[in-house]
Amino acid sequence: MSFTTCILVMIGGALGTLARYVVSVLSLPISRDLPWGTILINVTGSFIIGLFGTLTLAQGRFPVSENVRLFVMIGLCGGYTTFSSFSLQTLDLMRNGAVVRAMVNVCASVVLCVLAVALGHVVAAHWNGGAVQIAQVSIEEDG
């Protein structure tokens, strides 16, 4: 773990957090019954990590350095997506007696995010010219 890598992840996280804030504010008008902004953020973030993670593998269409993958997948996507907000909003729905809406939020978030990662991977694998195993970003020591 180098200083440069830490800075890249930190900058990615800051940019992802800013993007999350902007999307949250812009989605307020549609978030009356369910926290659609958080769902949108988590689904789009899941798609981005699936797409980028596959396209940028060494055998992918756009291979990039591990630092770039860390910047996007850990920093940007980590700062952008928000499991803690999802959890708090689900708890608030349950506390307010909206148990069915809370369960819809849980099911919609989980199913849509997994589908978004899969879709991102499928699109990227197609662009790569065939099936490619999706790989997580390596967070091991830089050596």
Swiss-Prot record:
Keywords: Cell inner membrane, Cell membrane, Ion channel, Ion transport, Membrane, Metal-binding, Sodium, Transmembrane, Transmembrane helix, Transport. Na(+) binds at G78, T81. GO terms for cellular component: plasma membrane. GO terms for molecular function: fluoride channel activity; metal ion binding. It catalyses: fluoride(in) = fluoride(out). It is a multi-pass membrane protein. GO terms for biological process: cellular detoxification of fluoride. It comes from the Bacteria. Na(+) is not transported, but it plays an essential structural role and its presence is essential for fluoride channel function. It is found in: Cell inner membrane. The chain crosses the membrane at residues 6-26, 38-58, 70-90, 103-123. Fluoride-specific ion channel. Important for reducing fluoride concentration in the cell, thus reducing its toxicity. Belongs to the fluoride channel Fluc/FEX (TC 1.A.43) family. This is Fluoride-specific ion channel FluC.
